[in-house]
Amino acid sequence: MSSIKIECVLPENCQCGESPVWEEASNSLLFVDIPAKKVCRWDSLTKQVQRVTVDAPVSSVALHRSGDYVATIGTKFCALNWKEQSAVVLATVDNDKKNNRFNDGKVDPAGRYFAGTMAEETAPAVLERHQGALYSLFPDHHVKKYFDQVDISNGLDWSLDHKIFYYIDSLSYSVDAFDYDLQTGQISNRRSVYKLEKEEQIPDGMCIDAEGKLWVACYNGGRVIRLDPVTGKRLHTVKLPVDKTTSCCFGGKNYSEMYVTCARDGMDPEGLLRQPEAGGIFKITGLGVKGIAPYSYAG
């Protein structure tokens, strides 16, 4: 990994950029800006950005088998029609918690849309604790609730053999694993596979590479780290020129590039002067490892 190159490919100034997803069909990167209520699509060939504004904070976006997208908006799972710039509600969660919203979400290998909730923050990572839960939206639009008492539901992905579900509840400062049943979507036997060190700060978004290793974006840590979930060891750290790194995914040709989102929420003018690319989209090349294609929602 000696020839790593990091560049800000899009100075988007996201308040809180999140949920990067590569769309191979259009050579584009999808991502959201949560408080700005925007879903964005950056064309890597033309460098143009299209944006769709929705009516509530949008925390994740994913591919839909129809060629359109699904997204978590407020506390709703929604189908997103890009051409019409409209969202249709598929299901709603946390009806009894008016201060909650969805956070990170991702589609599993069977086409279910997993996403978790959290209380709305009063400042970055400051919120009423234990208010969130983890859910999945099945292809028939029914919702399964896995567990509650979540602080900040965050990064998630699945092992290459589809037998393990990896999950982050940010304020536990841990990357956890569950046994995962592909057929039923059931998860069980929760355990920690990595505890973050102090300088790594808060674990946020996560993705898996083609070797089965996990990459975790560290909020306030200004880095992505590569972990071996079997040994529990950190294998590599890539530092970025911004502190508030939020999530990561692989994309580009053969999924050989990594894209990283970040935030500028809560930064003072001095901090923004020091980190003018905060809120931008970063591309990392030369990692020497590839990712895998994202799954599409099957509903």
From Swiss-Prot:
Record's subcellular location: Cytoplasm
SUPFAM superfamilies, per the entry: Calcium-dependent phosphotriesterase (SSF63829)
InterPro entries: 6-blade_b-propeller_TolB-like (IPR011042), Regucalcin (IPR008367), SGL (IPR013658), SMP-30 (IPR005511)
UniProt binding sites for substrate: R101, N103, E121
GO cellular component entries: cytoplasm; nucleus
Subunit structure: Monomer.
Coiled coil: none
GO biological process: intracellular calcium ion homeostasis; L-ascorbic acid biosynthetic process; positive regulation of ATP-dependent activity; regulation of calcium-mediated signaling
UniProt record similarity statement: Belongs to the SMP-30/CGR1 family.
Note accompanying the cofactor annotation: Binds 1 divalent metal cation per subunit. Most active with Zn(2+) and Mn(2+) ions. The physiological cofactor is most likely Ca(2+) or Mg(2+).
GO molecular function annotations of the record: calcium ion binding; enzyme regulator activity; gluconolactonase activity; zinc ion binding
Modification N6-succinyllysine occurs at: K144, K244, K253
Positions annotated to bind a divalent metal cation: E18, N154, D204
Positions of the catalytic residues: D204
Record keywords: Calcium, Cytoplasm, Hydrolase, Metal-binding
Gene3D superfamilies, alphabetized: TolB, C-terminal domain
Catalytic activities: D-glucono-1,5-lactone + H2O = D-gluconate + H(+)
Protein name, as recorded: Regucalcin
Cofactor: Zn(2+); Mn(2+); Ca(2+); Mg(2+)
Function: Gluconolactonase with low activity towards other sugar lactones, including gulonolactone and galactonolactone. Can also hydrolyze diisopropyl phosphorofluoridate and phenylacetate (in vitro). Calcium-binding protein. Modulates Ca(2+) signaling, and Ca(2+)-dependent cellular processes and enzyme activities.
Enzyme Commission number, as recorded: 3.1.1.17
Superkingdom of origin: Eukaryota
Lineage, opening ranks: Eukaryota, Metazoa, Chordata, Craniata, Vertebrata
